[in-house]
């Protein structure tokens, strides 16, 4: 195939599901080693939590975040192993939590650091965060106007016409009712989260998380990594990376900006690692979390980037075959 400029991408919270990673765990020894390493770092059995979870603890933020990072890394490592490390990214990006996996992919942090940081991050977000989140099929300006009116905040710009807001449940309800009156053809969907992530309702969690960031060393990334906070690339200094990860907790995830920025830099292939969404229960029935956003973002682009994924055995085999 023609020369590719590649982005490694990692989804965020909401891409977890009971049984995540089990198909690859059972098939590949290297994946089992990744899960063992994660369990040793975290102090609990991440495989059991991921595969057999009758209490749905996987949906608690303090567990969701390490579960997803473990799956991100297991998928990426396996892909690298089976391709002989010949498919190298020029850039890395992650949505919210996924930004930590992107920094790992770039060599700025290692796996143990990523797990320790996101474990603390998830625990603090779950304990000190407030509120809920709502996805609106509105452009930023309209969503921001509604959020300002009802004591809410913009949490993410996923598409030009999909903006996520966060606030207290009663404020989101008032916002949703006002939206239905003013934009009757638009939709809103309540998201299942433990708080209004990426809004001012996360300030207390961020203040406490700063100590975790300050205690970690960050190496200069080997490739450019997108910052959700700025919408562009991280600076290479440790102090700047720490600061932007701190600010990311209570500011919007500028995901559509990240995607446009990397394509402006020449990215023509996006490979998504980990997670999965869809109503089916098994890993084989899941689809990539970010694929729809990528396709919608660039549907009118003259040269839209290709999207591939490694989230289960089928996508792993398909992606490797397409890149052969």
PLM regions with names:
Residues 13-14, 42, 105-239, 247:
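Alpha/beta catalytic cores of group-transfer enzymes, especially the acyltransferase/condensing modules
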Residues 21, 25-26, 47, 59, ...:
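Generic, ordered loop/turn and secondary-structure boundary motif
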Residues 70-77, 116, 170, 207, ...:
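Short, contiguous clusters of charged residues that form electrostatic/catalytic patches at enzyme active sites
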Residues 185-281, 285-292, 296-300, 314-319:
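Acyltransferase
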